[in-house]
Regions:
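Short C-terminal boundary/hinge segments that cap the last helix of small helical domains
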Residues: 54-70
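Amphipathic alpha-helical segments of tetratricopeptide repeats
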Residues: 90-98, 130-138, 169-180, 209-220, ...
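Alpha-solenoid helical repeat architecture
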Residues: 101-106, 140-149, 179-189, 218-228, ...
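Tandem amphipathic alpha-helical repeat scaffolds
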Residues: 69-80, 108-120, 146-161, 183-199, ...
Length: 411
């Protein structure tokens, strides 16, 4: 512990000058060295200085040990993703920030505050916290430097600054031996997530498997589920259907047992994607219906699931009139061109193949390309390629097929 910093904290709190505090005990220059942690004073000197301020030094040591234990619990709750407990400890620690600033606990506390803000999705405070940490970096220990590399990487990814995240990851790999073992699983997970975002599903699978293995050995069961979900999504994108199917079933069961509602919902959605890829549209439809019932109407996520339900219903020849009516109500309220295009698309499905294909070719496909809706554009390109090939128009079929594959997943 930094005795001098704590001594200075209490001196300032008691509104004492250095001369007033050290009179008859030691020289002002010696007190200055103590307060700047340049020298370790004798026990007698420490006791006399604290007694002058009415503080029992032994009790102060016990107080320090208590706060050290709380900071360590804050760290462990963060590592093991116990967000409720982390928030409880954060509230307690935040009432003693002035004291913590005077101790050698401050770096670790401030580092994990950034991770706490990321978990809370409080990006303004997270951004502010990164600025604070930059100013503190010169005082970081090697361990704290290793921790900071991973937490900064998380910040870049949460901020969707993926280019900077990739650059940071390259720098991290140059100092791999300096990443604490406790953070290796997190580093593997973040790297897998970043590679997945870049559609490099093969490499992402490799690091997701490493994250799963690390979290399993570390008994980090909540983070294990997160890594398993990412792994199952990668398996889906690589058409490893049996591995993905088994993993999704495990994730859904464990997420439900553990009361992890958000993760359960994410697993439901991604399992439905797998089922649609396998042609099991009825199963996918049932999963999406279950998910939709869990969501708050009016949210962006609810809207996205409604659209996926419509796509699934159309693929599985499932009645979708009520879903179209619901999308119509949302479209009228929002007056969003994207939703208007989708609404017309689903309505044309119920009229004729020719009218649907004309609308897709003349309106929907150009609109989705222009506004960057690549997933929707690829879906329509695939349908148009099949349509033109069925009527012998191979030239157009090849054009749409080329777009579909060029914009496809880099597996």
């Amino acid at each position: 512990m930094n005795i001098g910093s704590i001594l200075k904290y209490y001196r300032m709190r008691n509104d004492l000058t250095q001369a007033e505090l050290c009179k008859g005990i030691c020289s002002i220059s010696h007190l200055s060295k103590i307060e700047s942690n340049k020298t370790i004073p004798r026990t007698e000197t420490i006791n006399e200085l604290f007694q002058r301020m009415g503080i029992d030094w032994e009790r102060e040591v016990a107080t320090y040990d208590d706060w050290k234990e709380k900071v360590e619990s804050f760290v462990m709750h963060s590592v093991y993703y116990d967000l409720k407990s982390m928030e409880e400890v954060y509230i307690e620690l935040s009432t003693q920030e002035d004291y913590l600033q005077s101790t050698d606990l401050v770096n670790r506390y401030e580092l994990y505050k950034l991770r706490y803000y990321l978990f809370k999705r409080d990006m303004p405070r997270a951004t502010q916290q990164t600025s604070i940490l930059r100013r503190m970096e010169s005082s970081f220990t090697d361990y704290e430097k290793g921790v900071s590399k991973v937490i900064y990487l998380m910040y870049d990814i949460f901020s969707q600054n993926f280019t900077e995240a990739e650059n940071r990851l390259q720098r991290i790999e140059q100092y791999r031996e300096r990443i604490p073992m406790l953070f290796e699983g997190e580093l593997f997970y973040q790297k897998a997530y970043l590679l997945h975002n870049r559609a490099q599903y093969g490499r992402s699978t490799y690091f997701a498997e490493m994250a799963v293995d690390h979290f399993l050995k570390d008994c980090n069961y909540i983070r294990l589920l997160h890594a398993q979900l990412l792994l199952a999504i990668n398996y889906t994108n690589r058409d490893f259907t049996m591995q993905a199917d088994n993993l999704f079933k495990t994730i859904l069961r464990n997420a439900k047992i553990m009361g992890m509602d958000e993760l359960y919902q994410g697993a439901l959605y991604n399992y439905s994607v797998l089922q649609n890829r396998r042609g099991l549209h009825k199963s996918a439809y049932e999963m999406l219906c279950e998910l939709k019932a869990l969501l708050e109407p009016g949210t962006d996520y609810y809207q996205a699931i409604l659209i996926h339900l419509l796509h699934t219903a159309s693929e599985g020849n499932i009645e979708m009139d009520s879903l179209i009516e619901e999308l119509d109500a949302i479209t009228k309220r929002k007056e969003d061109p994207y939703l208007m295009t989708l609404l017309t698309y689903f309505r044309k499905m119920k009229i004729s193949q020719q009218e649907l294909s004309d609308f897709c070719e003349q309106t929907a496909f150009p609109f989705f390309i222009k506004h960057g809706y690549i997933g929707e554009a690829r879906s329509i390109a695939w349908k148009l390629a099949n349509y033109h090939r069925s009527i012998g128009n191979d030239g157009k079929a090849d054009t749409y097929s080329l777009y579909y594959y060029e914009k496809g997943d880099d597996q």
